[in-house]
Amino acid sequence: MRTPAGISEADFAAAIAAFESVVGKEWVFTSDDDLEPYRDAYSILRDEPEERIASAAVAPFTSDEVQAVMRIANEHRIPIYPISTGKNLGYGGAAPVLSGSVVLDLKRMNRILEIDERNSYVLLEPGVSYFDLYRAIQDKGLNLWIDCPDPGWGSVVGNALDYGGGYTHSWYRNHFEAHCGTEVVLANGELLRTGMGALPGAKTWQQNKYGYGPFVDGLFKQSSLGVVTKMGFWLYPAPEAYISGVVGVPKKADINALVDVINYLENTVSMQGMPVFASPFLPFGLPGAPPPDMPTYDSPVAEQEAYAAAHNLPYWTVTVSYYGAPEVVKAQWDYTKRKASAIAGATFSGGDVVTMPPKPEMLKGMNRSLFGVPSLSIFFIGARSEHSDPTQGHITCSPIIPRTGEGISEAYDLIFRTTKRLELPVTILSPPIGCWARTFVILVMIAVTEDPAKNKRTRAGFREMIRILAEHGYGEYRTAPAFMDDVMETYSFNNHALRRFHETVKDAVDPNGIISAGRYGVWPKHIREKKA
């Protein structure tokens, strides 16, 4: 049996026995076979000495059991790594950041505690997936939508806590911002409720997120301060109609004005859905060979624009979506065309009003997430789609960039040059993604292989890219465990004041440093002292 670093076999055996007395022997896992699912399937350290491996896993069923487990762990100083469903592919999966930690697997806590149709909210546990929530709403015949990411098998709570995003209305697709009220078990086993939940018998816990005094929910986003056992979310009242339209512009430089138009529409709530930008000339696009005569990303702009004109292709397009009453979405699409017509040569297509709910035949071949319907269709993109037993995964570089056309051009030029120079095995470079208001994120997916030598080179290049992007003002919002310290190192304003603040809070709330050590680059005092 593996043991955490610094813990004797006798003490660990005593803790395991105590865990078994709380959750039942069948829900404590220590064998290699049982711990295999808690390895990161996409780990760039897989089968290397540095791979992050759990020493055990415990699967509680209730908040009371979580409290008891945390008291035991705190007493024995056992490192604990909470997960919701462990589907965080590309960002660590179910594996701990600190090797030897005991994974606290919350997937058995899969209860939907309340769905309120009149006030459009839900209260649920961390084991509830987007599929679970969608089915519950459909089974009850409720007039509500969810906003879901790709893919839909993950935890609603887990995705929000890692700052995930979706596709529908701007008020809901920032999943952490759409939460309202959190229940947290602290390292000592104490139970905390945030916002109005701190008031016994509160009637508005899922309706007012701020409550009284400082807003502390953000301390549990991408955090190592507690174990979230309940979370409320605002849901989207099902819209009556939907419109999707496409705006195209002919010149590369037109992206500047196009983004400005879209920003205005979003910031005035004249458009609700996530804007999807695209260009046939972006590098490292989705799988599929481009025409042999098509200019590449680094071809002269004049050649690109001439090719686009000759083939009746816009240089840039943005797909826009609208949700609401039929007459409202029609007016919003007309308004979009009026605003975008100021760009010379702008073209428009689509714009048909579609009555909701969507018919099954309409969903075929479409991104179902646009309609709050979870799916696994994302796995039809890339290497895993063609192999039932794939041998590679990916890590993702996820820089946040300005929501301007100039920001798009500068960031893509930098990423293209950097990945080429570092010979990073890019599989997909996403278009600028606008799931959050005010910024874009770009997803740079880098292949992970079974070859340790290749993975070692990739790790070195990935770290260099993190540093270069940061030097140009682009910070990562999320990363795999192997690079969490590297990303935190870039957030260095005023001699790393942010990290030092995180450490101060960590040492106060979790003095024994047992929860998620190293997560997002925040280490407890006893490990920091060893590293010094």
Regions found by a protein language model. Give the residues of each.
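FAD-binding subdomain of flavoenzyme oxidoreductases
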Residues: I112-I115, L124-T268, A532
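Conserved glycine-rich FAD pyrophosphate-binding loop
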Residues: R2-E9, A14-A17, K25, D40, ...
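Glycine-/small-residue-rich beta-strand-loop submotif within the FAD-binding core of flavoenzymes
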Residues: I44-I53, A94-S129, W171, L235
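Short cationic amphipathic helices and targeting signals
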Residues: T3-G6, S55-P60, V122-L124, G245-G248, ...
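Residues forming anionic-ligand binding surfaces in small-molecule and nucleic-acid pockets
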Residues: N110-E117, T229-A241, H311-L313, R384-I395
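Short, conserved charged micro-motifs
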Residues: E65-A68, D132, K252-V259, P326-Y335, ...
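Generic secondary-structure signature for well-ordered alpha-helical cores
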Residues: A17-K25, E75-I78, Q138-L142, V184-L191, ...
